[in-house]
Amino acid sequence: MKLIIFTGLVLFAIVSLIEVQADNERACLPQYQVCTDAPGNCCSNLVCDCYGRYKSGARIGRNCFCLQKGVIYKREN
């Protein structure tokens, strides 16, 4: 009986470790991908940069994209 309980605990520990490793190894988001729901998932050379959307002075939403660190984007007319 003790052997069955011990085996079950060992299997549970192994499955837990596998799940933790899978979470740590998730793929990062490449440049220009939307990161609104996952701001920490951009690749290491990128940052999740967010912009508010406005219509007639009222905020209607927010967009976030993985962009290069240190780069400033300006609107062109």
Swiss-Prot record:
It is found in: Secreted. Its main location: secreted. Residues 1-20 form the signal peptide. The keyword Secreted applies. Keywords: Disulfide bond, Secreted, Signal, Toxin. One of its GO terms (cellular component) is extracellular region. InterPro entries: Spider_toxin_CSTX_knottin. It comes from Lycosa singoriensis. This is U8-lycotoxin-Ls1f. Contains 4 disulfide bonds. GO terms for molecular function: toxin activity. Residues 21-26 form a propeptide.
